[in-house]
Amino acid sequence: DVKEPLKGNVRHSVSKWCFGDYKLDEFCEICKHIGIESVELLDPVDWPIVQKHGLTVAMAQGAGLGIDRGFNDPALHDELVASYEKVIPMVADAGLTNLICFSGRRNGVTDLQGWENCEKGLKRLIPLAEKHKVVLTMELLNSVGHKDYLCDHTVWGAELCRRIGSPNFKLLYDIYHMQIMEGNIIENIRKYHPYFSHVHTGGSPGRAEIDETQELYYP
């Protein structure tokens, strides 16, 4: 239940996986009623369902090999590139912009080697992403819950963006994950926001509502 619709000061999107009991059609109707503009982290088969309700998909998925198997592993580059080459045009054809990607596990490599590995794989896709005006967006995740995840600090992700050097590669900044890893949320947003294409919010601990029970509270 929502007491009043959203004011529209922020363009709100929600991740469907957090609300698994709802059918997507029903969920979209609820979202539209309260002023949410997007339902995200959906595969291509679901995009038309969202769009028929006048909503969008702020962060698309459907390419890649999951969180643990990402661009840090050169042995996966050919498979990853083939997957993204298929989905990037689909994102553009649907009128969407952001497509999620992942670094994968660290697997014992240094930060430097991780940058080099990810840069090598992702740069194979940048010309296609630029052609279709799609932004490949790597999510910053905590490596406590996602064991050994490489892209787990804002400064690491920002340096990868700098190395790739294209507006078509950016970061998904997740307040919940980064509060666990590093805190300093407001300063990091101010400093690194040019590298963000999208932001996820969630309280810590427990990814709860951002209220007075959480480490961060935005009234």
Question: What is each of the regions a protein language model found here?
Answer:
Residues 4-6, 73-171, 180-182:
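Active-site acidic/histidine proton-transfer and metal-coordination neighborhood
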Residues 57-59, 138, 173:
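Hydrophobic residues in well-ordered beta-strands that form the structural core
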Residues 44-55, 109-110, 213-216:
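Active-site-adjacent beta->alpha loops and helix N-cap segments on the catalytic face
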Residues 47-61, 118, 134:
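Short acidic, glycine/proline-enriched helix-loop-strand junctions
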Residues 61-69, 203-204:
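Short, acidic/turn-prone active-site loops that include or flank metal/cofactor-
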Residues 1-35, 40, 45, 95-97, ...:
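Histidine-acidic metal/acid-base catalytic patches
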Residues 41, 60, 101:
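Short beta-strand and adjacent tight-turn residues that come in two discontinuous sequence segments
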